[in-house]
Amino acid sequence: GDWPEPHDDFFITQWTKKGWVRGQGVFDVEMPNFNKDYSASVDSMPVPVITHEIGQYAVYPDLKEIEKYTGVLEPLNFKGVKQELENKNLLEKADDYLSASGHLAAILYKEEIERAMKTPGISGFQLLDLHDFPGQGTALVGLLNAFWESKGVANAEEFRQFSAPVVPLARFSKAVYKNNEQFTADIEIANYSSEEINNKNIKWALTNASGQPLQEGIIPLTNIKIG
């Protein structure tokens, strides 16, 4: 259903009667916008909401994974992709396809998780998936492969920047700015740790691609409740 029943203690869903609560149906029809969240979709929700199977962003097969299947399970899907690339003289592009699709997936997972954390009415999320799922055909939806190994597109430290007990968040209007435009952002903190954060200074910095600070400052003596 699209709304909880009278006796439900919580509600797990990908959409409500008021709209989507995951990136599907949003990211592919809207320009990138980091001000938005899913508040309108969960307005007046009477119970906690868990977003269902968010993510599912496909990554091109890592053909180096073929040699890891040494038991009874044959990676026929990977072998089929490899054969198709060979037939089209594109096998040398396989690593480029993996890298490009993988880094795009990492960006989308980041925005997916951060948008959920920006929504006051969402209590948690179920991810599909951190690793590829080989149980039903081909579901190469992970930043890790089926062996729980990195695909080289995001390491644990990078992933924890947007999926951790405490996550800094920024709201701003678009992804691309011209050099004559002013950049303005609102800073938020998602705190799902075991305790409140009290009387702490929050240091922020805006850096360029080389990591050099363009602007920085301190938000003084901030109290952050759990949630």
Predicted regions and their residues:
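Short beta-strand segments of immunoglobulin-like
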Residues: 172-177
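Extracytoplasmic loops and strand-loop junctions of Gram-negative outer membrane beta-barrel proteins
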Residues: 32-33, 168-170
